[in-house]
Amino acid sequence: MTALHPGDLLDHYRIEKLVARSGMASIWRATDTLNDRTVAIKVPHPEMEADPNLFERFKREREIGEKLDHPGVMKVYKDDHRSRVYMVMEWVDGVLLRTLMAQGKFSPERAARITARVCEALDYIHSNGVVHRDMKPENIMVDPEDRIKLIDFGIAGNEGSRRLTFANLSNVMGTPDYISPEQVKGKRGDGRSDIYAMGVMLYEMLTGKVPFTGNNPFLIMNDRLLNSPKPPREIDPSISPALQEIIYRALERDPKNRYASAREFAKDLEHQDQVGVADRPEMHDWTARKSHWPKRILNYVLLALVPVVIFTLLLWVARKT
């Protein structure tokens, strides 16, 4: 397939402007000539269209998007008459949450408002049996009134979908800064994994930092298995004890101790005066975290070796074939 350019006609969509580009696809603003509606069109790069994994991802994202109908979820329009693989979505006048976060920390009121709205959208998709599995600031759009849209359901799955294995690591795992501890351990994850990711984003909006760090993705993921995040109020004392408690509940390492639903998360954000603050001794002194250093170092070494092992296996397979 040839590349698109402004002015081209893709079936009955007139291409107007390139608005975003990733390693796999480009997103164009276009006009549907049948009804004069402005839309966004997601088109895989020509060299990627023959990739069966990409085709499956596009198919999954399109099918999930077509069945969801909520103000907080970007709508995917159904259109069975297409000459090539692409996806037609509603046009949203807004920016990525990541773009807003790059401008600086949010006020507690704004961070809570945006997070609550995202949680309302998450509650809707979870009630329809869908888990996003890649919640991050790049997958949330925000308009000038702070209304949100969830986007990119490319690695989303229905409840009961396959668990994480090394064979599907890159397709199912999510993003290291926002992945939940249970997903790091190779478990399937559920709606509470999306809640965890939203807790990370709330922490980041308020403090300007992610709660867990490392020099590579494996160390970032390992950090959340071994350590507790620095208390947000130590970074910014203007954060209320109740809001800090809400973050802690969303970031519980064990999903059973997290919010049971995104609706509960949103409710606490909307009624912070009713949130009880628990005594959390492990959070009192960030510099004196109780960790077993030999075990931690061993974990670091093992995780640092994982990329080497994977590369070696891939090289061995390539030589054999």
Where are these regions (language model features)?
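A short, aromatic-enriched beta-strand patch in the conserved N-lobe beta-sheet
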Residues: 78-79
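Activation segment signature within eukaryotic-like protein kinase domains
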Residues: 114-115
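Protein kinase catalytic-loop region centered on the HRD/HxD motif
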Residues: 120-130
